[in-house]
From Swiss-Prot:
The keyword Disulfide bond does not apply. It comes from Phytoplasma australiense. The gene is gltX. This is Glutamate--tRNA ligase. It holds the Pfam family Anticodon_2. Belongs to the class-I aminoacyl-tRNA synthetase family. Glutamate--tRNA ligase type 1 subfamily. The lineage of its organism: Bacteria, Bacillati, Mycoplasmatota, Mollicutes, Acholeplasmatales.
Length: 448
C-alpha cells in the first residue's frame, strides 16, 4: 500500500460542528492506524460565508479534542500553501489547461466582460466508484449539467479546488459526510480530464438525534458545536471517545477506550451504513466516567477560567472548593453542573417541601433525634472526621430504622431528604448554617 494521506478541509465559517469534528476524527484515526499523514487544509474561497477567527476556532477546537496534523496552515509542508485563498494561481492554471483542451468554456455574464469558466460534462458517460462504506455507486453524465469551475470573481468552485488540491497534496483517501456523495462524479471528471489517479472515497452516514432526525439548532438538548461542550466542562477525552463511536463499531467488547486503543481498533470495514444516533445520555455517561478520574486541581483550574459563571462559588477558598468538588465529583456529568448543585444544596433561603413535612409528621422520634444531634454537633470542631462518629453513635443508640434515621438527620441539618455524603456536606455548609437549620426544624416539631 502506498503512503496513506488523508485530509480534513473545513471552511472557516464558525466553530467546529459535531459532524465536522467526527469527519476530522475519522480521517485522523485512519491515518494514525496506517502510520499515514493527516493534513489540515482550509477551504476559504466562499468569501461571503467566511467569519473572523473562523480558522483559529477550528484549529483550537481540533487541538482541544486531541487531533493534531502533520501539515496545515500553521505547519509548513511540501504541498503548501494550505489555504485555498493562497492557491488561486494554481486553480487558474489548471482551468486554462481545460480551456485549451476544449474540456471547459467561458460563460460570459450579460455585460459580456465578466465570465465564469464551466466544465463541459461529457455526454453519455457513466461515472462509477466503489465507496469504502457503501459499495459501488454510479452516476450518469446526462443527470449533471455543465458546472462552474472558476467563478466570475476568479475564485474556484468547491469541487474544482478540492479535486486539484487532493491530487497535488497526494491525498489517498477521502472520508467525508454522505452529503458529498453527489460531488464525487464532478471530482472524478477532473481527475479523468488530467489522467490523474482517483483517491478512494468513504462517505460517512448522517448523525441523527434520538428522534432519528437530522441534528438542528432546534435540538435544545444537543449542543451543535465542540466549543459548547468545552465551555460546559466536558472533557476532550470523553468527546474523542464518544465521537469515535458515531458510525464505527469496534471489535472491542468495551466502549470506554483510550485514543491509542481506538486508533489500534479503527477499521474502515467496521464503519456503519446506517445513520449514527447522537445519544446525549451516553455522552454524559462517558464524561462522568472521565470526570471521576480527573484530578481535583484540573477541575479547580477549569472553574477559575469561568469566573463569570462560577461567581457564586467561594473561588478564593481553595480548601473549601476542593472539598466541594470532591463531594459532587462522582455525581456530575459535566463541570458546569457544579453551579446548579451549589444553588440546590447551599441556598440558605430554601423552604421545606411538602414531602419533607409529611415525612417528619410520620416519625414521632424526629424531635428527640434532632435535639440530640444539635447538642452533639454544637460541641465539636466542624469537620467530617468529627461529624461522622456522631452520626454513627446516634444510629447505634437509637432504636429506629436506620434508613429513616439517616433521612431524619439529613432533613434536620440540610432541609432536604436526599443529597451527597452527609458528614462532608455538613462540614461545607458550616456549623452556623447547620445548627440554624436544626433549630428551625426542632422549633417546627415542638409546635406541631
Amino acid at each position: 500500500m502506498n503512503k496513506i494521506r488523508v485530509r480534513y478541509a473545513p471552511s472557516p465559517t464558525g466553530f467546529l460542528h459535531i459532524g465536522n469534528a467526527r469527519t476530522a476524527l475519522f480521517n485522523y484515526l485512519f491515518a494514525k492506524h496506517h502510520q499515514g499523514d493527516f493534513i489540515l487544509r482550509i477551504e476559504d474561497t466562499d468569501l461571503l460565508r467566511n467569519v473572523a477567527d473562523g480558522e483559529a476556532s477550528q484549529l483550537k477546537n481540533l487541538r482541544w479534542l486531541g487531533i493534531d496534523w502533520k501539515e496545515g496552515p500553521d505547519i509548513n509542508g511540501p504541498f503548501g500553501p494550505y489555504r485555498q485563498s493562497e492557491r488561486l494561481t494554481i486553480y487558474q492554471k489548471y482551468a486554462f489547461e481545460l480551456l485549451e483542451k476544449n474540456l471547459a468554456y467561458r460563460d460570459f455574464e450579460k455585460d459580456k466582460k465578466n465570465f465564469a469558466i464551466r466544465f463541459k460534462v461529457p455526454p453519455n458517460q457513466t461515472f462509477t466508484f466503489c465507496d469504502l462504506i457503501r459499495g459501488k455507486l454510479t452516476f450518469l453524465s446526462k443527470e449533471i449539467e455543465d458546472w462552474v469551475i472558476i467563478k466570475s470573481n476568479g475564485y474556484p468552485s468547491y469541487n474544482f479546488a478540492a479535486s486539484i488540491d487532493d491530487h497535488l497534496m497526494q491525498i489517498s483517501h477521502i472520508f467525508r459526510g454522505e452529503e458529498h456523495i453527489t460531488n464525487t462524479p464532478k471530482q472524478i471528471m477532473i481527475y479523468q480530464s488530467f489522467n490523474w489517479s482517483i483517491p478512494k472515497f468513504a462517505h460517512m452516514t448522517l448523525i441523527l438525534n434520538q428522534e432519528r432526525k437530522k441534528l438542528s439548532k432546534r435540538d435544545v438538548n444537543v449542543c451543535q458545536f465542540i466549543q459548547d461542550y468545552a465551555d460546559l466542562g466536558y472533557l476532550p477525552q470523553s468527546l474523542f471517545n464518544f465521537l469515535s463511536l458515531l458510525g464505527f463499531s469496534p471489535s472491542s467488547c468495551k466502549e470506554i477506550l483510550t485514543p491509542q486503543e481506538i486508533i489500534s481498533l479503527f477499521d474502515v470495514n467496521r464503519l456503519n451504513k446506517s445513520p449514527a444516533i447522537f445519544d446525549k445520555t451516553k455522552l454524559d455517561f462517558f464524561n462522568n466516567h472521565y470526570l471521576r478520574k480527573t484530578p481535583i486541581d484540573d477541575i479547580v483550574s477549569f472553574i477559575k477560567t469561568k469566573l463569570d459563571f462560577f461567581e457564586v462559588l467561594p473561588i478564593n477558598n481553595q480548601k473549601w472548593l476542593t472539598k466541594f468538588i470532591l463531594l459532587f465529583q462522582e455525581r456530575i456529568n459535566y463541570i458546569k453542573q457544579l453551579k446548579d448543585l451549589y444553588h440546590h444544596f447551599f441556598d440558605k433561603n430554601t423552604s421545606l417541601s411538602e414531602e419533607v413535612e409529611q415525612f417528619l409528621k410520620k416519625h414521632d422520634c424526629a424531635l428527640s433525634v434532632l435535639t440530640l444531634f444539635y447538642h452533639k454537633l454544637n460541641l465539636v470542631v466542624f469537620e467530617k472526621e468529627a461529624i461522622n462518629p456522631i452520626i454513627a453513635e446516634i444510629a447505634q443508640n437509637m432504636k429506629i430504622n436506620k434508613k429513616n434515621l439517616f433521612v431524619i438527620l439529613r432533613i434536620g441539618a440540610t432541609h432536604k431528604m436526599q443529597g451527597p455524603s452527609l458528614a462532608l456536606f455538613l462540614e461545607l455548609l458550616g456549623k452556623k448554617q447547620v445548627l440554624n437549620n436544626l433549630s428551625k426544624i426542632v422549633e417546627l416539631l415542638k409546635n406541631q
